[in-house]
Amino acid sequence: MTVLCTLMAFVMVVAISSLTVDAIPHSHESYWDQQDDIDRDEFLELLSRLSRTVMNRPEMENSKRGLDLGLSRGFSGSQAAKHLMGLAAANYAGGPGRRRRSEQA
């Protein structure tokens, strides 16, 4: 019985390994090509038009909905230090806040 099972398994392995299937040829058409996608001249024209729009409209500079590239009012280091000092003072037992009557006596 084991000889028959071993022989059958060997025949199956040989039959499966003898079948060769060629893969579909790989195509690069679905990849994004950075060189062909955006024309350099068009990109520079877009940037120049955007800068002219911002320069011609001074109210955009102080507007809430102006163009913000993340360079205007960020969270500075001194603000972070003040925040951490406030947290430390709030957690300190003798720090700011309302005093309990039991602590005042």
UniProtKB/Swiss-Prot annotation:
<dbReference type="GO" id="GO:0007589">
    <property type="term" value="P:body fluid secretion"/>
</dbReference>
<keyword id="KW-0165">Cleavage on pair of basic residues</keyword>
<dbReference type="GO" id="GO:0005615">
    <property type="term" value="C:extracellular space"/>
</dbReference>
<comment type="function">
    <text>Regulation of fluid secretion. Stimulates Malpighian tubules fluid secretion.</text>
</comment>
<dbReference type="GO" id="GO:0001664">
    <property type="term" value="F:G protein-coupled receptor binding"/>
</dbReference>
<keyword id="KW-0027">Amidation</keyword>
<keyword id="KW-0964">Secreted</keyword>
<dbReference type="GO" id="GO:0008613">
    <property type="term" value="F:diuretic hormone activity"/>
</dbReference>
<keyword id="KW-0372">Hormone</keyword>
<protein>
    <recommendedName>
        <fullName>Diuretic hormone class 2</fullName>
    </recommendedName>
</protein>
<comment type="similarity">
    <text>Belongs to the diuretic hormone class 2 family.</text>
</comment>
<feature type="propeptide">
    <location>
        <begin position="24"/>
        <end position="63"/>
    </location>
</feature>
<keyword id="KW-0732">Signal</keyword>
<dbReference type="InterPro" id="IPR034439">
    <property type="entry name" value="DH2-like"/>
</dbReference>
<feature type="modified residue" description="Proline amide">
    <location>
        <position position="96"/>
    </location>
</feature>
<feature type="propeptide">
    <location>
        <begin position="101"/>
        <end position="105"/>
    </location>
</feature>
<feature type="signal peptide">
    <location>
        <begin position="1"/>
        <end position="23"/>
    </location>
</feature>
